[in-house]
Design a protein with these regions (language model features):
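Mid-domain Rossmann-like dinucleotide-binding core that forms the NAD(H)/NADP(H) cofactor-binding site
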Residues: 136-221
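C-terminal hydrophobic helical "lid"/dimerization subdomain
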Residues: 1, 200, 225-226, 250-254, ...
C-alpha cells in the first residue's frame, strides 16, 4: 500500500509499505477513507517534534471503515464508519477516568498515530486501544462532516468548554486558522453576547465574514483598542489564543478584562514570557487547551443535529497520489487554503 512517510528532517515521501496487521487484542485495522493535513504534520517535517520517529507514516486526522478488530475491541465492528482519535488512551488510568485523556499514562498513550507509530495518510492504519480511539459515525453524517472530529475540532470543543463561556460574555478568539475556526464554531454553541476574531490575514478575515457574519473582526494592530470599544467591562471576558505567533500571547492577556479567563490553545515555537509585574492586579486565570479527545461522541451528535458544520473548512481535495502537491499548498498557504481532504482512489 502507499504511505506518506517521514524519511528525515525536511523530507516526506509516498512509499510502498505492507498493510498493517493486528498486534494486540485491543487493536483495530481501519481502511482510511479520508485524511487531512495538520500543522503538527509540518512541525514533524521541520524537525520540531523530537519524539517523532523517522520511518513512520504521518497523519493523525482521518476517518475510515473498520476492516478488522481484535478480540477485546468493543463498540465498533468491521464495516462501521469511524472517526479516529488523535490521542491513544487507555480509559482506565487516573487521567482518563477524569476526562483528561490527553494525559493518559499508558505506554501507548498520548499522540502516537502519525508521530510514534504509523498514522493515517495512507490506505490502512492500525489503531491501538481501539475501543477508546474509534467512534462510530452516524449514518446521516458524511465522512467530510466527520473528518476533523478526532483532532482539530476536538481541540476547539475542549477549549470552548474549559473557557466557561456564558451568554453575557465578550469572547475574543485570536487566530482564524483551522483550529481557530473550529474554536470559533464551538464557542458559538455557548451563545455569548459577542465574539471578536483577531486575524492578520485579510483572506481569512473574509472567510470568517462570509461564513459567520455575526462575528466581529479585527487585526492584531487594532485588536486592543477594538476589544475595549466592543466590550462591557474594559476588555474581553474570555480570550482564546489560537494563533501561536510571537506577539499573540501578550496580546491575549492585554485584551482580557480583570478576572477574565485566558485559554491558550496555540502551540509556540519558543518560550513565552509571563510578565507578572505588568499584569499584577488583573487576577487572570490562565488555562491551556491542548487536544483532549474525550468529547468526540458528543461532537458527533452535534454534527448529526446540524449544530456543528466544519465542511466549509475543506477548501481543497486531493488524491493520495498527489499528496506532495497538497502539502505544498497547505504549508505555503496558497490558493486560499484552510484544510485539505486527502482521499484514496
Amino acid at each position: 500500500m502507499k504511505a506518506y512517510t517521514y524519511i528525515e528532517k525536511g523530507n516526506f515521501a509516498l512509499i510502498e509499505k505492507h498493510k498493517p496487521e493486528l498486534q494486540a487484542s485491543t487493536d483495530a485495522i481501519v481502511r482510511v477513507s479520508l485524511s487531512s493535513i495538520c500543522s503538527s504534520d509540518l512541525h514533524i517535517k521541520h524537525g520540531s517534534v523530537p519524539r517523532a520517529v523517522p520511518g513512520i507514516t504521518v497523519g493523525h486526522e482521518m476517518v475510515g471503515v473498520v476492516e478488522e478488530t481484535g478480540s477485546d475491541v468493543k463498540g465498533v465492528k468491521p464495516g462501521d464508519r469511524v472517526t479516529v482519535n488523535v490521542e491513544t488512551f487507555c480509559g482506565e488510568c487516573f487521567y482518563c477516568q477524569h476526562g483528561y485523556v490527553n494525559n493518559c499514562t499508558s505506554p501507548h498513550g498520548g499522540w502516537a498515530l502519525g508521530c510514534r507509530i504509523d498514522g493515517g495518510q495512507t490506505e490502512y492504519v492500525r489503531v491501538p486501544l481501539a475501543t477508546q480511539g474509534l467512534n462510530r459515525i452516524p449514518d446521516n453524517v458524511t465522512d467530510e462532516q466527520a473528518l476533523f472530529v478526532g483532532d482539530v475540532l476536538a481541540t476547539g470543543f475542549w477549549a470552548a468548554r474549559i473557557s466557561e463561556i456564558s451568554n453575557e460574555d465578550t469572547v475574543l478568539i485570536i487566530g482564524a486558522g483551522p483550529t481557530g475556526i473550529c474554536t470559533l464554531i464551538c464557542a458559538m454553541l455557548k451563545q455569548p453576547k459577542r465574539i471578536i476574531v483577531c486575524e492578520p490575514s485579510e483572506e481569512r478575515r473574509n472567510f470568517v465574514k462570509q461564513h459567520y457574519p455575526d462575528v466581529l473582526l479585527t487585526t492584531p494592530d487594532e485588536c486592543f483598542d477594538f476589544v475595549h470599544e466592543n466590550s462591557d467591562h474594559g476588555g474581553a471576558d474570555r480570550v482564546l489564543e489560537v494563533a501561536g505567533a510571537k506577539t499573540t500571547f501578550r496580546l491575549a492577556w492585554q485584551c482580557a478584562r480583570p478576572n477574565a479567563i485566558v485559554t491558550v490553545v496555540a502551540l509556540y515555537d519558543e518560550a513565552q514570557i509571563l510578565p507578572l509585574p505588568d499584569m499584577y492586579g488583573k487576577n487572570l486565570t490562565f488555562k491551556t487547551g491542548g487536544v483532549d479527545g474525550c468529547d468526540c461522541e458528543q461532537v458527533l451528535q452535534l454534527i448529526e443535529q446540524g449544530k456543528i458544520d466544519t465542511t466549509p473548512l475543506i477548501t481543497h481535495r486531493f488524491p493520495l497520489s498527489r499528496i506532495d502537491e497538497a502539502y505544498r499548498i497547505f504549508e505555503n498557504k496558497e490558493d486560499g487554503v484552510i484544510k485539505i481532504a486527502i482521499y484514496n482512489e
